[in-house]
A protein has these predicted regions:
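PRPP-associated nucleotide enzymes
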Residues: 1-189
């Protein structure tokens, strides 16, 4: 745990963003815990504080462009960009795949940091990094508010998270009894 973990957890709890139930995650895995970052993102004072904490804890420097995948990373990515005085662009879903649209582009002057809300298995981060790597920019690294993965993630670039929480995840056919007793829900992701 870092110096800010208890504050970050408190922010998630105060905003009802740390949920407990039987959830189907975007990865298809099941969990008894879910970070619904959209609940935090309703409160810009909390978003501002989380962005400030992220910038205090990350080691990435001289960033001039923030890229976030829609939807989860948009609000926190934009606030980090605002605090840095950096440009903010986003990737959005087209036919369930991420794409860089709206005449957004990256070039050799861009030092890019990818910002996401929550990482579990890293699929969305990998997809976003694949898109960014097609441009002649310098990809500095990736950061998330929450890393809930149970293993060390390797994205081919440095990855840091404000909060590391290892809640267990399960295959649908290997659920513990407490989750078997609850109907599964797929929260917005």
């Amino acid at each position: 745990m870092n110096d800010f973990d208890s504050e970050v957890i408190s922010i998630f709890e105060e905003t009802n963003a740390l949920l407990k139930w039987h959830f189907i995650l975007r990865s298809g895995m099941r969990s008894g815990h879910f970070f619904q970052c959209a609940q935090v993102c309703q409160h810009m004072d909390k978003v501002t504080r989380l962005a400030t904490l992220i910038l205090k804890t990350i080691s990435f420097k001289d960033i001039n462009t923030i890229v976030s995948p829609a939807m989860g990373g948009l609000v926190i990515g934009q606030e980090i960009a605002r605090q840095l005085g950096a440009r903010f662009i986003f990737l959005e879903k087209v036919n369930d795949r991420l794409a860089l649209r709206r005449n957004f582009s990256l070039d050799s002057k861009d030092r890019v940091l990818l910002v996401e809300d929550v990482v579990t298995k890293g699929g969305r981060v990998r997809e976003a990094l694949d898109i960014i790597s097609k441009y002649e920019c310098e990809l500095v690294g990736a950061v998330s508010m929450v890393d809930r993965s149970s293993e060390e993630l390797n994205f081919g670039v440095p990855f840091e998270a404000l909060l590391k929480m290892n809640f267990p995840t399960y295959e649908a056919d290997k659920l513990p009894q407490d989750l078997l007793n609850l109907p599964a829900t797929k929260p917005g992701s």
